[in-house]
Amino acid sequence: MSDLSHIRNFSIIAHIDHGKSTLADRFIQMCGGLSAREMEAQVLDSMDLERERGITIKAHSVTLHYKAQDGKTYQLNFIDTPGHVDFTYEVSRSLAACEGALLVVDAGQGVEAQSVANCYTAIEQGLEVMPVLNKMDLPQADPDRVKDEIEKIIGIDATDAVACSAKSGMGVDEVLERLVHTIPAPEGEIDAPLQALIIDSWFDNYLGVVSLVRVRQGRVKKGDKILVKSTGKVHLVDSVGVFTPKHTQTADLKAGEVGFIIASIKDIHGAPVGDTLTLSSTPEVEVLPGFKKIQPQVYAGLFPVSSDDFEDFRDALQKLTLNDSSLQYMPESSDALGFGFRCGFLGMLHMEIIQERLEREYDLDLITTAPSVIYELELKTGETIVVDNPSKLPDVSAVADFREPIVTATILVPQEHLGNVITLCIEKRGVQRDMQFLGSQVQVRYDMPMNEVVLDFFDRLKSTSRGYASLDYHFDRYQSANLVKLDVLINGDKVDALALIVHRDNAAYKGRALTEKMKELIPRQMFDVAIQAAIGGQIIARTTVKALRKNVLAKCYGGDVSRKKKLLEKQKAGKKRMKQVGNVEIPQEAFLAVLRLDS
């Protein structure tokens, strides 16, 4: 296939649960990528976690051969992308390798905010977007309304959108036919010097770094010497190939194709995502425009439960960062938890997924502290600093201005749930920017503090709108706010890992709620445990976990009151002594209690 006109590179854009992984399964089945025995639901979601949660986390690539009605055989390079708002960067990376995208919309549910955002990313990158209506076999499918929504909300022509049902297989061949005609073939010269973009890479214990690349110009084969532009290092190619979805070696990868390169790179940072590869004989090749470095929105401390695991934890993080370029981390130490890392994530789901992957794939036991966003502080000396950890806040007297990050949140919601959504946004200190009625849905835009959005806004939004509202948000600016640091003291000692930054108006309520929650979670000891919430030197809430005590009077029967007093005093003195030397074990749930204050 030396001629590029036979190649089509595309990805699928869709909201969570609109059926993109099932559609991918149908494509693989129709093009004979796997035998009937190997076929299983959601073939591409290979991580256990992806299958359990039913979401796609990583982008996956597959090369299929499709014999079209015009008698030609087309090579389809298809990249599956995640739909959740936390994994938008995975989507933009996949789109950079394609010439077109299928916009899959559930014909019953209609357009959702997340697919709108990803669709704009695709259009900005100059991709041809082709709308597909999925789940047409459902009784509630309403294709005309949904076509209307696609045109009104996204603004692309949907009059001839293909209708199909990925589950039953209806109309899928029509989707492939249309795709071959609508999506343009890649451009590139096979005889030009090699120029390839790394879309994704992961670490294999046997093979070293495996990179998924899109070849723009030239060709690469086994035995070539490749140069990684950013590191300047040269590696020998061991094998190249494609996923069909099985790992299949090929003779070479040519311009326009998507496949993997293994060059026994042992250094984890040897082939960063977004980098350009070329042959060592042509080092002057231009660097391809990569992806913008994504900024984490949420920071949390991750600490190994046993300090002996620290080295393993560091290695695990390094390997995971290669596979997930948006994860950032730096070492941190806490008085309460010892040594660990402060990690940056894109959102709460991303944080949960990373923690679960670390615990499963690398067999670690971890404690996570409550997540926090990045604040900007202007000190009285005139300098501006950024703080991502509440325990690192300078003294209040030194701060002139406290600024919190504000995001612009776009929410699409059916009209009947609009009231609940507005109430929720106001409760989260949101300011309404505009509201548009689009068909049966309403699009509202709010400016909201990121702190409120990141923690549990998504879950609350889903529950108040019975799952119909969808959310997309992006960082807008920093804005002054009246914020304070809430410390938690246990038996008079500050626990740095439990500190959080809250708005002054909510401080007393949050303090009370937090101490109550901690009281339920900290197990009873042999002595009283005082839990206090404080702002600066002022205690705003307190609860006590009562001591467990033996009934020392059981052996007295009748007996004299002074005898009973003596025994009780003796017990009291013992408890007091114990309290001076006693340590309180704080369980993992207590660190995350901060998240669930409202529930």
From Swiss-Prot:
Belongs to the TRAFAC class translation factor GTPase superfamily. Classic translation factor GTPase family. LepA subfamily. Signal peptide: none annotated. One of its GO terms (cellular component) is plasma membrane. PROSITE patterns: G_TR_2. This is Elongation factor 4. It is an enzyme of class 3 (hydrolase). One of its GO terms (biological process) is positive regulation of translation. It catalyses: GTP + H2O = GDP + phosphate + H(+). Its EC number is 3.6.5.n1. Keywords: Cell inner membrane, Cell membrane, GTP-binding, Hydrolase, Membrane, Nucleotide-binding, Protein biosynthesis. One of its GO terms (molecular function) is translation elongation factor activity. SUPFAM superfamilies: EF-G C-terminal domain-like, P-loop containing nucleoside triphosphate hydrolases. It is a peripheral membrane protein. Transmembrane segments: none annotated. GTP binds at residues 17-22, 134-137. HAMAP family: LepA. It is found in: Cell inner membrane. Residues 5-187 form the tr-type G domain. Coiled coil: none annotated. Required for accurate and efficient protein synthesis under certain stress conditions. May act as a fidelity factor of the translation reaction, by catalyzing a one-codon backward translocation of tRNAs on improperly translocated ribosomes. Back-translocation proceeds from a post-translocation (POST) complex to a pre-translocation (PRE) complex, thus giving elongation factor G a second chance to translocate the tRNAs correctly. Binds to ribosomes in a GTP-dependent manner.
